[in-house]
Amino acid sequence: MKLIASNKKAYFDYEILETLEAGLALLGSEVKALRQTRVNLKDNFVKIIKGEAFLFGVHISYLDTIHAYYKPNERRERKLLLHKKQLLKWQIEASKERLSIVGLKLYFNQRNKAKIQIALVKGKKLHDKRQSLKEKALNKEILADLKHHFKG
């Protein structure tokens, strides 16, 4: 698995409940751009429209070598390739519990197919974000103390 891009902000802003791997319907020039890691997953989300899942907000820059006539929209919606049962299950869960679906990681699998790991998430409140920052700082301090204790 070759990691192309990761959405680190999603881990901070959301509580991740369930993850799933999905394929992407891409153009040839977009696949070439992915191989050069010219992608940004920062503010992406998944919307289910008429029984199909679409990924919005992913920015895939086109290559400099592309012809001026053929320049696809860098932020266009991209279709996700999922099984119908998985899609229906997630659609019901997301609408029932007011959850969101976001992309976490974009990568090439062993067969060189572009895949995205999507997650069913619940938004964190401000105090939850502060709590996770405190826990992170505390863990960092504990690790530093342990390292210092065993080193000297």
UniProtKB/Swiss-Prot annotation:
It is found in: Cytoplasm. One of its GO terms (cellular component) is cytosol. Pfam families: SmpB (PF01668). The keyword RNA-binding applies. Transmembrane segments: none annotated. Its main location: cytoplasm. Signal peptide: none annotated. GO terms for biological process: trans-translation. It comes from the Bacteria. Keywords: Cytoplasm, RNA-binding. GO terms for molecular function: RNA binding. Disulfide bonds: none annotated. NCBIfam families: PRK05422.1 (NF003843), smpB (TIGR00086). Belongs to the SmpB family. Required for rescue of stalled ribosomes mediated by trans-translation. Binds to transfer-messenger RNA (tmRNA), required for stable association of tmRNA with ribosomes. tmRNA and SmpB together mimic tRNA shape, replacing the anticodon stem-loop with SmpB. tmRNA is encoded by the ssrA gene; the 2 termini fold to resemble tRNA(Ala) and it encodes a 'tag peptide', a short internal open reading frame. During trans-translation Ala-aminoacylated tmRNA acts like a tRNA, entering the A-site of stalled ribosomes, displacing the stalled mRNA. This is SsrA-binding protein. It comes from Helicobacter pylori (strain Shi470). The gene is smpB.
